[in-house]
Amino acid sequence: MAILCFVFPLINDEFEQSLTVTLILIMAISTLFEYFFGIVYNLYLQADKKYYVVSYVQIFCYIFNILLVVFLIYMGASIVVVKIANTVAFIIKPIFQYYYVRKKLKIDYKKVTEDYKIENKFDGLSQHVAYVINVNTNVLVLTAFTNLATVAVYSIYNLVTTAVDRVVGAFTNGMDSIFGDMFARNERESLTKSFGMYEFVYYSVAMIVYLPTLILIIPFVRIYTSGITDANYIQPIFAILLVIFTLFSTTRYVYSSLIYSVGHFKQTNLIVWLEAIINVVLSVVLVYNLGLIGVAIGSLVAALFRLICFMHYSSKVILQRNFMKSFKWLFIVFFQLIVIILFMHFNIINYVPTDYLTWAFYALIVLILSTVFVIFVNVLCNFTLAKDVFQFIKGKLFKNKVH
């Protein structure tokens, strides 16, 4: 953080140095709180299958942040005040986790064995460092090699895809502990069957969310940036690439949740670092001639590389099943993407919403059609899995009715 405060004002001098440093420090506070107060208790709640507590607090923080920021902007508050409010909203989560675990669950820290050692802790740390590099590559490369207008365009689209990623990624919450428990009990057959059904549900949910995003993101940005003329915010090719990259980045959670649940950090360390290296190298090389599209291509290739590697590792090493059972999902995903992109290219759905209300109506129609399309294709390609999932859901519903 100290390096960023010193170096960034030298790279970008569009604002006063004091303002730049102040904003960096304000934005860093929520991250510091998350890692120094919240991360340990977050992981504990996840391992204890109480991640719903984190989800509820997170939802509250998001809503509170939106209301607070909108109010301050409406009142004409400065960017510094708005960012302080944003930080305050998000430090609620780690502070709540800290007190919830320590008070409500009443952990006795005196019973902790002094000579206990966490295996692979440095490999886990190494993967996190690679993750931080990877998720910040796009912004850093664009900041260093392009102008502020380009970064602003990226930020708008990234705002949408990040929100979508969090919605879909929520379906992996708690799966680590479930898979880890099955693996520890050596219930390989149950683990393999459960994971297959989980793949089906996760890919179905992901495509039901991401296909509408592919169609709706440009109309949303057009409405969101109406009247703003500092940059060309309508970037359809970049939008498509960024959405597909985020889709691949999100779907890897299916396999990373399995890999990390069995503690295979060291075995997958190289894959994670290669992803970061591919992303950085391709983004830097391509940004000169392609700008936004260049960094999107770099991120997409890197995410696809890691997704395939994690697919292969989880299938061959952990589940000990045919790799094609996972790999065929890529063919299904690409088929669905191509169909939607062709629909967009030939303007088959020729409707342009003009405000948020008409956009919401349009989004509802697109969501319904996408849901029908995704379920039809996924069931057609995975009939046996679909049947197992249906029986599982039916059993759960029937059980709840009985009780």
Model-predicted segments: where are they?
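Membrane-interface junctions at transmembrane-helix termini in multi-pass inner-membrane proteins
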Residues: F33-Y56, V80, V101, L105, ...
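Interhelical loop/hinge segments that connect adjacent transmembrane helices in multipass membrane
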Residues: I79-V80, I95-N136, L140, G174, ...
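Membrane-proximal transmembrane or re-entrant/amphipathic helices at the cytosolic face
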Residues: M344-H403
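Interfacial/gating helices of multi-pass transporter permease domains
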Residues: T20, I79-V80, Y116-N120, G124, ...
